Amino acid sequence: MGAIQALRGTRDILPHEVGYWQQVERVAAEILSRALYLEIRPPIFEQTALFERGIGEGTDVVGKEMYTFKDRGDRSITLRPEGTAGVVRSFIEHNLYATGGVQRLWYTGPMFRYERPQAGRQRQFHQIGLELLGSGDYRADVEVIALATDILQTLGLKNLKLDLNSVGNREDRQNYRQALVDYLTPYKAQLDPDSQDRLERNPLRILDSKDERTKIICQDAPSILEYLGTESKRHFEQVQQLLGDLNIKYQLNPCLVRGLDYYTHTAFEIQSDDLGAQATVCGGGRYDGLVVELGGPATPAVGWAIGMERLILLLQQLQSTPTLTPDIYIVSRGEKAESQGLILAQKLRHWGLSVELDLSGSAFGKQFKRADRTGAIACLILGDQEAENQTVQLKWMTSSQQQTLTQVELLSQLEELKQSFDRHRQSRDD
């Protein structure tokens, strides 16, 4: 019987890669916590109706890409294809709006879409996202954009560009929709099959087509910016002004429409020239009607999601794989020494030092070679004599200096030793 392998469109995040993921999560959590965003953890699967109502039945996500099944109670269940709908459902269900103020929330976790797998796009993929609920102010739009750029720049990403558009309010979009259909209808036979289908049910999505012929046709399409009402136009102008005041560069892209029906007013994407076809690292916008659509009170909101797989592809181009290196590597030989080694390892870990214990039981020479390969700052050596005398040999790996300490002395000098390890660690990292 053959070995079972991971399903197509999924992949294992192996130990040597996990450091990148932890780095992204740590940076995002630090930046978002400083802006008073609180983490929320909705379920991975929800009632299918949540996404049909929230995302829109005419979207590709709902029509083609969702993992939907019946559970044993004959309920229609869907693995979440995105994070916003679940956060909004939780916001409504738990009356988070009752405080009357702004709710700043963020989340991270896996999402699921049945797509053709390629670099940076999997059927199980991961996002970090945020939602700012309760403010229709243009400053909220700029706040979330600024936080996204802060995260990406803190991670060291270069060659980023911010595409910006407004899709207006519902009335603006209805007026524009008709103008777009009137323009595209004479070209229907020349559009790609997906766009021909969208012409009737979701024509704005044609602007986002990747088909070259369709893209050429759309170049001369009317711009949605020409159909914005006074209120929508003012909101968008204020967003642009404040982005400029923050020195956040952007370019207007009237063809930018997000793939989900709930967006209103500001829509944006952050892209990288270093990613090829899958260039979008972050996408988001305002969705003032979604809370009402899902049964809650009228609540303006804005948010975004960062695709972690694509972000990590960029990090891997920028930096070597993050590795864990121990402060101390413990080598021991002999039953009593090996037991004492484990006890010391635990005590040192409790003091905040990273410690690797050699469990091979092999000769000292082989253990020393392994210690050297780990990049450890120091090595603790315990043999029969040390075990008998309750001592250890402390060897600094860079200088080969070695000293004998009683185990009591070692533990009593831990604070001083920690400072020495900090200096060695800083020197090594530099």
From Swiss-Prot:
InterPro entries: aa-tRNA-synth_II (IPR006195), aa-tRNA-synth_II/BPL/LPL (IPR045864), Anticodon-bd (IPR004154), Anticodon-bd_dom_sf (IPR036621), His-tRNA-ligase (IPR015807), HisRS-like_core (IPR041715), HisRS/HisZ (IPR004516), HisRS_anticodon (IPR033656). Coiled coil: none annotated. CDD domains: HisRS-like_core, HisRS_anticodon. Keywords: Aminoacyl-tRNA synthetase, ATP-binding, Cytoplasm, Ligase, Nucleotide-binding, Protein biosynthesis. It catalyses: tRNA(His) + L-histidine + ATP = L-histidyl-tRNA(His) + AMP + diphosphate + H(+). It is an enzyme of class 6 (ligase). Its EC number is 6.1.1.21. It is found in: Cytoplasm. GO terms for biological process: histidyl-tRNA aminoacylation. The keyword Phosphoprotein does not apply. GO terms for molecular function: ATP binding; histidine-tRNA ligase activity. Disulfide bonds: none annotated. PROSITE patterns: AA_TRNA_LIGASE_II. The keyword Aminoacyl-tRNA synthetase applies. GO terms for cellular component: cytoplasm. It comes from the Bacteria. Homodimer. Belongs to the class-II aminoacyl-tRNA synthetase family. HAMAP family: His_tRNA_synth (MF_00127). This is Histidine--tRNA ligase. It comes from Gloeothece citriformis (strain PCC 7424) (Cyanothece sp. (strain PCC 7424)). The lineage of its organism: Bacteria, Bacillati, Cyanobacteriota, Cyanophyceae, Oscillatoriophycideae. The gene is hisS.
